[in-house]
Amino acid sequence: MIEEQEAPIQYALGEPARRTGLAGLSMRATVVLACGFGAFLLFQLMGLGRYAFTVVIPLTFAVTAIISIRVTGRSLAQYVQMMWQDYRRRSTGAHIYVSGGLSRVPGGRRRLPGLLARTETKVGFDSLGREFVAVLDRPRREATVILDIIFTGQTAMTQAERNAMTADWSRWLAQLSLSGDIEQIVVVVATRPGSGSLVANEVADIIADGAPEIARRVVLEAAAVISVARPEVLGHIAITVKYDSTSIKDDSFLNQLGTRIPGWASTLQWAGMMATPLSCDGLVSRIHSFYNPASEPDFERLMLDGVGHGLEWADAGPSVAETLAGCYKHDGVQSVTWEMREAPRSTFEDTLLQSLIVPHDRVVRKRVALC
């Protein structure tokens, strides 16, 4: 008897939440129309009706159109703002970032560029005694915790098991959304060419001391062959929590995070992910290797030897970086970013993002961030 295989579930996102005003326009466009109408009445009462018709009304409709018309997911006003910000950045030379002892960075450090330059790290321990690190943004009163993820979703499983994992992932997100203090959750899946150090270390551990020399050589050569330029998949989940100023000042937020992290990590296993809090050394090495890929083998060797790298959060950034219109250059490499213009309008299955996340032969390094 052949069992009937369960069909994949069709998912849908629905319509995004949107605040609408007059005639379906956005609230910002409605405010512009209201201000324009008020200015029109004021000009009429002042006896300046000609200016009301020739200046106020055209200007009001022009501003409303700039705010309302959207191209590839952004309004014309947002494009104008981005162009103005890029012009100001280039005119002041802020698009070129240089760190180190001879730079203008305070203390000669190699801080992360942009808004991350003002962040700092705080180390704590959860209720299970595991070390975790919180990236603190004091002006915004936000603390971000990073969970290191090992994905198990590519193992052989039935459609029913995949459906259950997808449902558990949705349930995990829904539980976090009900807490009220979580600002954002970002899932990052990164692929990179493996250096072979991790495979060689695993093989060395499983070889018995009394193994024949020919068997030992065969195993080591096989490990060397399969580990050359083989892609490795890294993943982490960043959870940003909002706190009050008192909790930020006395670092009491670390105790609160310490009680919540074990619950966040343990429930992820039902969604096919093994999660552990990322330590400060692990976070700094991962962020720095994103900016400077040449440092990855060094970090791996230090990790296998059980030696800390001694790099602080204030030195996790690049030495040199340049922001261009079509790419971002940093420490001898070049990165290009693509943004999803809009979410799928129709229904989709749970494998929608699989081709985007899995390693690709023609893309050596890539990172996919789901916000």
Regions found by a protein language model. Give the residues of each.
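Extended, folded cores of ATP/NTP-driven motor/assembly subunits in large transport
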Residues: I2-T30, Y51-C371
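Hydrophobic, membrane-inserted alpha-helices
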Residues: L33-F43, T60-V63
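Short, hydrophobic transmembrane alpha-helix segments
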Residues: F43-G49
